[in-house]
Amino acid sequence: QNFVLMGHSRGAMLSVLIAASEPTRVKQLMLIDGLLPIPVDANHAAKQMSRYVSDFRRPHRAKKKGFQNRNEAVALRVKAANLPIRVASILAERNLKLIDGEYFWHVDDRLKAASALKLTHEHNVAFLSAVNCPIHVVVANQGMGNYDKFKEMMQSFPWIYWHKMEGHHHLHMDEQAKDIAKLCTEHWR
């Protein structure tokens, strides 16, 4: 069975790895503000694993901060993540839980943790070379990646199409959602 993958941030990176591993099944990628993991030198592998182990243990010990009301929690998310209030409010709908009279952000702390293993530049190139389908990458001009660096690196991959948009890392949850949806309908086959 063939399929299209769409991913945001780490989900975008994982989509590339899956497409490279299943090149006959994945027929298209739509990636939002993500493409590849930031490469590391191979000699940093042990240090990276150490960070992963440390980060993996930390969430289980950390006491989460409770908020008196929803607005207080949303305001902190706006400040901490530099998000518009409407996007932080959408995140709150999904991720705020009321427990014993206080609001808590309920997210998987492992999303903030270091990866167990990181890929080298050569690994990234090998994975991209194994992808056998068009890749559409929506890049937020205020997003996480270094657009110019990735665009320069990817010029040797003609099946990668860049779509730079105004917006932040979570632009797919904001006004640009319609533009991204239009892009999907234009390019998915």
Would you name each region that the model predicts?
Residues L183-H187:
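C-terminal alpha-helix
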Residues Q1-A45:
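Conserved hydrolase catalytic core segment
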Residues G34, Q142, G167:
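Active-site loop/turn elements of alpha/beta-hydrolase fold enzymes
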Residues M165-A177, A181:
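Catalytic histidine-centered segment of alpha/beta-hydrolase-like enzymes
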Residues V137, W162-K164:
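Conserved beta-strand scaffold positions in the cores of enzyme catalytic domains, especially
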Residues L98-Q155:
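Conserved serine/cysteine hydrolase catalytic core
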Residues I32-G66:
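A catalytic-pocket lid/entrance helix-loop region that shapes and gates access to the active site
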Residues A62-K118:
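Conserved alpha/beta-hydrolase catalytic His-Asp/Glu region
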